[in-house]
């Protein structure tokens, strides 16, 4: 459901049923904006979600969450599931498995700002398992001849929808990868301290030793991280009007060595969701529009209507979709190693004298100035070694800290349970 908003927030508005997309000028005042409602029910027991927001104007790409709306999911048997407003514009309700069976149908009802909005009913259609996930190594030639080519992996899936299965699908992907910092910790700057023995101020720099067990743990403490994130792309497919419902080699997404994702270990969790014909048209045109325009930020405003309408004002434009989807998931992991393309750890402060001045924050040897002027510690320094592989204490430099602290690239030090 968050994926829907990620694309709508870019101002992409398309027609759903027309194969030819025509420019559209909305029949709303510049100050009125429009309402966005997204919701979904899956066959997985647990919380089902909806999201409600409004823009301040038609051309505004900032969405303002709407709270304190009355939101309900109603199934075909008349069961009502009231959604709680648990976060800004976010609503949820818990549904047990007994209410999430194949063939059940659901609608979303929203009462907000004195108006009632309802979706069409959408049904849970049967979903086959994902049979396999695999990849092929590829090379991508750049459009700019001055750039180097990239290598990467093209992922594919197979599934068999022969029999009583849905015809329309979309896929979501969550990727996780392990990566290392470019360097381990060897030198730690902890500020300025007063040495009572020598009666003078000194830099507090700790040099770690590989022969000390605790130091070795410190060296590796910020070296290895993991990142998990959603893949921000749309993938849809339909077997409508196709005799063979067995699908092999369906391409999904590409990951390249432009980042650090393929340096150690990479895992992808793919979620396969069934779609009704209305939901498929909605997602498929979002996918087409984003591909044709080189990204959704480059699109012009079009109208994208889903299956939600205002009962009190049929002329009101309501953006978004409520859908019901059966879900199957499968994880694939590979330990393929591809060197990261063109990455360099630059010095922030190079040269011993410059580094001393930077770390001291004032005249060397004198009491340090206001602590607010000192660099934040700890800082991890870059060492240099001589021909005998001995540390040269007069040649430290300060490099980008993300080259030593892997968490500064967005990762966590906690290994995933499935790793």
List the model feature ranges, each with a label.
Residues 1-8:
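Bacterial N-terminal signal peptides that target proteins for export
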């Amino acid at each position: 459901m968050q994926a829907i908003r990620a694309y709508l927030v870019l101002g992409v508005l398309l027609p759903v049923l027309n194969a030819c997309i025509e420019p559209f000028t909305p029949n709303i005042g510049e100050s009125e904006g429009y309402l966005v409602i997204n919701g979904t029910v899956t066959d997985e027991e647990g919380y089902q979600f909806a999201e409600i927001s409004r823009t301040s104007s038609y051309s505004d790409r900032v969405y303002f969450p709407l709270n304190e709306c009355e939101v309900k999911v109603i199934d075909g048997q008349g069961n009502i599931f009231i959604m709680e407003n648990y976060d800004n514009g976010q609503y949820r309700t818990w549904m047990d498995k007994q209410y999430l069976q194949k063939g059940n149908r659901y609608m979303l009802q929203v009462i907000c700002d004195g108006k009632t909005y309802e979706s069409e009913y959408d049904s849970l259609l049967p979903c086959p398992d994902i049979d396999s996930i695999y990849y092929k190594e590829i090379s991508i030639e750049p459009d700019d001849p001055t750039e180097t080519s990239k290598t990467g992996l093209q992922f594919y899936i197979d599934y068999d929808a022969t029999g009583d299965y849905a015809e329309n699908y979309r896929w979501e992907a969550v990727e996780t990868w392990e990566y290392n910092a470019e360097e381990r910790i060897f030198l730690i700057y902890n500020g300025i301290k007063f040495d009572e023995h020598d009666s003078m101020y000194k830099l507090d720099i700790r040099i770690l030793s590989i022969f000390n067990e605790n130091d070795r743990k410190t060296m590796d403490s910020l070296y290895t991280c993991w990142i998990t994130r959603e893949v921000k792309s749309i993938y849809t497919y339909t077997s409508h009007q196709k005799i063979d419902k067995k699908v092999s080699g369906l391409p999904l997404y590409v990951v390249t060595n432009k980042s650090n994702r393929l340096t150690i270990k990479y895992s992808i969790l793919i979620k396969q969701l069934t779609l009704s014909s209305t939901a498929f048209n909605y997602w498929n045109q979002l996918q087409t529009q984003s591909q044709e325009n080189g990204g959704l930020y480059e699109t012009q405003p079009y109208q994208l209507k889903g299956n939600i309408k205002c009962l009190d004002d049929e002329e009101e434009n309501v953006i978004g979709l409520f859908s019901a989807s059966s879900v199957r998931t499968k994880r694939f992991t590979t330990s393929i190693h591809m060197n990261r393309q063109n990455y360099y750890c630059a010095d922030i402060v190079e040269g011993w004298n410059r580094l001393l001045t930077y770390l001291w924050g004032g005249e060397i040897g004198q009491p340090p100035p206001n602590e607010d002027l000192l660099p934040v510690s700890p800082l991890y320094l870059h060492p240099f070694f001589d021909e005998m592989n001995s540390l040269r204490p007069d040649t430290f430099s300060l490099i980008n800290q993300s080259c030593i602290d892997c968490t500064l690239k967005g990762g966590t030090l906690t290994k995933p349970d499935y790793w």
